[in-house]
Amino acid sequence: MPPSKGLNGKLEKPKHALQAIVLSDSYNYRFRPLTLDKPRCLLPLANTPLIEYTFEFLALAGVQEVYVFCCAHAGQIREYIEKSKWNLPSSPFSVNTIVSRESLSVGDALRELDSKQLITSDFILVSGDVVSNVPLNEVLKEHRKRREDDKNAIMTMVVREASPFHRTRARTESSVFVIDKKTSQCVHYQANERGKHYVSMDPEIFNEHEELEVRNDLIDCQIDICSNDVPALFTENFDYQDIRKDFVYGVLTSDLLGKKIHCHVAKENYAARVRSLQTYDAISKDVLSRWVYPFVPDSNLLNQTFSYQRHQIYKEEDVVLARSCIIKARTLIGAYTKVGDASVVANTIIGRNCTIGSNCSIDSAFLWEDVVIGDNCRIGKAILANSVKIGNNCSIEDGAIVAAGVVIGDNTIIEKNKRLTTFESHSQGTLNDPSLVGIGGRGQEYHAEEDSDDEGEFMEASGLIESTNELHLSDSESSETSSSSEEDMEFIPFSARRDSANTINSEDFDEGDFNKEAQQSLERAFEENHQIDIAALELNTLRMAMNANYHEVRSAIVLALLRRIMHLDVSPKEALAKVMTRWGPLLAKLTFSHEEQVDNVLTLQKYCVRLSMTRHFLQLLGYFYQLEIAEENAIQEWYSDPRSSEGELAALRDAGGKQFVDWLNTAESESESEEGSE
């Protein structure tokens, strides 16, 4: 899809306008379930959307043209920008949006950017969750000077000096930078793996550089100044996905490219990235402590009315506080919020239009907008998203995440690290279970989807509360390289997907080299309307060339079919019929046994859950049956297979699966009855 017209109408761009690319998608799961219905870049940090801090940082740097690369929830991002001050004639830069439906990683985004030929000179590459007041003027001058002297100096990474255990450093970040002390050239980069306590370097590096610094004390916010060679290199190297682990490492270890990457180490100022709930908490506290000045609450970046009081207390106008309530240090309260009698609030950020009852204790919590808390409640270090309602006499323990719209009944305890959501397709357990959300409550426990790591490591990487046993540290970007868009959304009408995207965790779907090639082959087959035999021949040739098995082939086909269904700009019913009747026979052609038919249904079940297509599983199962991708006995065996009821798959088996099996049994009984009557 071509980029949208500059939202504030600035069609004439300077010859060498300073450009910036903002990656609005995080390509990981860490903020779920908060990001099931809202992109991370629009989550509130001290009552201000994250992307505002990124835009202010770019304005401070003198950027004149911004491209916001959108994937999931693209419509929300575009709407927000259209209504923001950045769309006014007074904006210091023009804003353009690029919507990609296929982007699975930073690498995919930069390849698409390269294909559009929008970058005319050096540009700044940042994520939409960066909070920084580092001035880039001198950094840009240094970068340009290096480029004049050496065209191979293609990139400058801006990193911040801090201790290895600084609180704004993600718990899983332990990247090592080896830097030439004289030239600031980065000669080696290593994203450490869990349990790895050494750095592997080419000995030749020591012969080529007189003095080297091996540094593990740098916070990498992924603020990069890039030449326009960088997107082209991603295009030339299609396996590059992550900007650090793939691109930087690949460039530095390549004898052929001959390119150079430098580091600028910021020793003053502030730079951090909200890459996990742990850093969300830390950076929020830093904003209240004024480390990010001038980007502080009383600067009122939006249409706000904050005033600053002693002990780092911030209040907007129209806040109603009971005489006997106590507001302690490092607290922010949004407009139209009410706090009841004898309640104590400390180290807490409260959004607009919240109501807090009497005799409550709230410490180190985050309350977003329209939150209601009853009387006699205790709220620990937790996040309560928009429109959450907490009954009387409740306790929300440390680490709990209560997503938008969840209702907690009276006399309920939400245990430590529990995550609740109203999205049934991303939850486990019984809907509105009184033992979980209380009598009259609404919501279910969120079930963390596993990507490249096990669930425990996922929770470690994204948890709100810290634990000393997590300080062994592992790779900072383990889930950023190739994960599903964290802002993965529920399955919405297909016509609404033209300007939004549903990204997929490449680890979840075993997207190794074979699957990537298979997806490209199938996409060509779809677009060029190949015959089934030709498409099957191409897949078989690819399978033999890459030593893959037929299970991988069939899995790739199922994934490609579902992607195709999602991206057609027609109704769900039409999309299902069009894709399955045309391309379902390809899957049937490459299925050779009863066991493989069972495997097909298991694969379909898994992908429907991961892609939030659970409501269409029943229809898809019907097509599998009609097209003999899975015959009746295979579907019956799938239903009895323990694998079909593992974890998050159980709900789908017990709903659509049971309904289809019941239909099969009824049809068989009727058939037997008719035969008996004859």
From Swiss-Prot:
Region span, Disordered: 467-489
GO aspect biological process, one term: cytoplasmic translational initiation
Subcellular location: Cytoplasm, Cytosol
Residues with Phosphoserine modification: S500, S506
Entries under InterPro entries matching the protein: ARM-type_fold (IPR016024), eIF-2B_epsilon_N (IPR035543), eIF2B_epsilon (IPR051956), NTP_transferase_dom (IPR005835), Nucleotide-diphossugar_trans (IPR029044), Trimer_LpxA-like_sf (IPR011004), W2_domain (IPR003307), W2_eIF2B_epsilon (IPR044123)
One GO CC annotation: cytosol
Domain W2: 508-674
Major subcellular site: cytoplasm
PROSITE patterns per record: W2
Keyword check for Lipid metabolism: no
UniProt keyword annotations, A-Z: Cytoplasm, Initiation factor, Phosphoprotein, Protein biosynthesis
Modified residues (Phosphothreonine): T172, T503
Highest taxon of the lineage: Eukaryota
A Pfam entry, by short name: W2
GO molecular function: guanyl-nucleotide exchange factor activity; translation initiation factor activity; translation initiation factor binding
Subunit structure: Component of the translation initiation factor 2B (eIF2B) complex which is a heterodecamer of two sets of five different subunits: alpha, beta, gamma, delta and epsilon. Subunits alpha, beta and delta comprise a regulatory subcomplex and subunits epsilon and gamma comprise a catalytic subcomplex. Within the complex, the hexameric regulatory complex resides at the center, with the two heterodimeric catalytic subcomplexes bound on opposite sides.
Similarity comment: family membership: Belongs to the eIF-2B gamma/epsilon subunits family.
Function: Acts as a component of the translation initiation factor 2B (eIF2B) complex, which catalyzes the exchange of GDP for GTP on the eukaryotic initiation factor 2 (eIF2) complex gamma subunit. Its guanine nucleotide exchange factor activity is repressed when bound to eIF2 complex phosphorylated on the alpha subunit, thereby limiting the amount of methionyl-initiator methionine tRNA available to the ribosome and consequently global translation is repressed.
Name of this protein: Translation initiation factor eIF2B subunit epsilon
